Amino acid sequence: MHALARVWARLEEGLIAFLLAAMTLVTFVYVVLNNLYTLLYDLADLWEGGNETLLAIGDGVLTLAQEMTWSNALTKALFAWLIFLGIAYGVRTAGHLGVDVLVKLASRPVQRVLGVIACLACLGYAGLLCVASYDWVKTLFIAGIGAEDLDHFGIRQWHIGLIVPVGFALVFIRFAEILVRILRNRQTGLGLADEAADALKLTEHEEPKA
């Protein structure tokens, strides 16, 4: 079980890294192409000897740039997947911010009770949205509508929307893991990010000024 959890954690991190890299690469290529052809045209005006060659290359680059109208739609789709995978990843790594000042003033048993209540609320929210979004994706699947600017690649709207129920299912699993840890007395709360504690750690590691 622990081995499976480690494999999934690595896969989750790999998917997030891939999505970030793909978004960056697509955007970079699109921006370069849209600026390169103007540079080639300017050089063609300045260099008479290579005028025809530079114009031909510029025309080719311009054609590629015009054909990349799908880049914006793809970037948005990748970003949507990144968001919902990132929500579950944030729950696992305690990356989400929360206000728990009053909770920390309570005794440890009370903190555990409040943690269970908060965890159950999060489970209910994630479960509700998972079921609702599943029905939505099912409707998109039946309709078979192509994704805007991506339909010529065979990408349908339900392909992009599929991450919504999947993402909330992952969030549900992560909060279920937290609930188990709370009930086993291995954790008291949701494990939210603590900016104050992080700032103190950074201060402690700073070298003393001369």
From Swiss-Prot:
- Where is this chain primarily localised? membrane
The induction field says:
Expression is maximal in early exponential growth phase and declines with cell density to reach a plateau in the stationary growth phase. Induced by the C(4)-dicarboxylates succinate, fumarate and malate. Positively regulated by RpoN and the DctB/DctD two-component system. Negatively regulated by DctA.
Membrane topology classification: Multi-pass membrane protein
Q: What happens when the gene is disrupted?
A: The dctA-dctPQM double mutant shows no growth on malate and fumarate and residual growth on succinate.
What keywords does the record list, in alphabetical order?
Cell inner membrane, Cell membrane, Membrane, Transmembrane, Transmembrane helix, Transport
Q: Which InterPro entries match?
A: DctQ, TRAP_DctQ
Q: Name one GO molecular function term.
A: transmembrane transporter activity
Task: Give TM segment ranges.
Answer: 13-33, 77-97, 113-133, 160-180
Report any one BP term from Gene Ontology. Answer: C4-dicarboxylate transport
| The keyword Cell membrane belongs to this UniProt entry's keyword annotation | yes
- Which Gene Ontology cellular-component terms appear in the entry? plasma membrane
Q: Does the keyword DNA damage apply?
A: no
Subcellular location, in the record's words? Cell inner membrane
- A Pfam family reported for this protein in Swiss-Prot or TrEMBL: DctQ
Subunit relationships: The complex comprises the extracytoplasmic solute receptor protein DctP, and the two transmembrane proteins DctQ and DctM.
Family in the record: Belongs to the TRAP transporter small permease family.
Known function? Part of the tripartite ATP-independent periplasmic (TRAP) transport system DctPQM involved in C4-dicarboxylates uptake.
User: What more does the entry say?
Assistant: The DctPQM carrier is more efficient than the DctA carrier for the utilization of succinate at micromolar concentrations, whereas DctA is the major transporter at millimolar concentrations.
What is the protein name for this chain? C4-dicarboxylate TRAP transporter small permease protein DctQ
What is the protein's species of origin? Answer: Pseudomonas aeruginosa (strain ATCC 15692 / DSM 22644 / CIP 104116 / JCM 14847 / LMG 12228 / 1C / PRS 101 / PAO1)
Q: Which gene encodes it?
A: dctQ
